[in-house]
């Protein structure tokens, strides 16, 4: 059923509505206010956000990839997310802090040459299990 809803959403131009046209040429081009009102209605259904490819955490992750991702990251991760073929995750649950607040993360990052070294620990991953 969800695949049929996704097909219909694409036909109606209701796909990836949260992204600006600068990041996604097929975007309906809603303002943040307009999309906020739409998101309020989508939130009344357990499946609506996924049916129009506007479900968290994918929306935020797609925005980050669209704005900051390099070409290889966009090809490997952004395009499949935009197409609705994969789901993503945002992991922030750490064992020593109440990390439902993304600003409370203990993870550290340092630059070494052209690379960034991440040092941290995620205690569990419950995102995306059983979605399909």
What are these regions (language model features)?
Residues 1, 21, 92-94:
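Intrinsic structural disorder
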Residues 3-75, 79-84, 125-130:
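Internal helix-loop-helix
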Residues 28, 68-132:
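Glycine-rich, Trp-frequent "lid" loop and neighboring beta-strands that shape
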């Amino acid at each position: 059923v969800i695949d049929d809803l996704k097909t219909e959403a694409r036909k109606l131009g209701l796909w990836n509505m949260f992204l600006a046209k600068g990041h996604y040429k097929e975007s309906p081009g809603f303002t943040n206010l307009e999309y906020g009102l739409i998101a309020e209605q989508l939130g009344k259904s357990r499946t609506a956000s996924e049916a129009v490819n506007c479900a968290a955490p994918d929306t935020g992750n797609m925005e980050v990839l669209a704005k900051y991702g390099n070409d290889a990251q966009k090809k490997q991760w952004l395009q499949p997310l935009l197409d609705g073929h994969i789901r993503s995750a945002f992991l922030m649950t750490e064992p020593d802090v109440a990390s439902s607040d993304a600003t409370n993360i203990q993870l550290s990052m340092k630059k070494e040459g052209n690379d960034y070294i991440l040092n941290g620990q995620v205690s569990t991953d419950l995102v995306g299990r059983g979605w399909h």
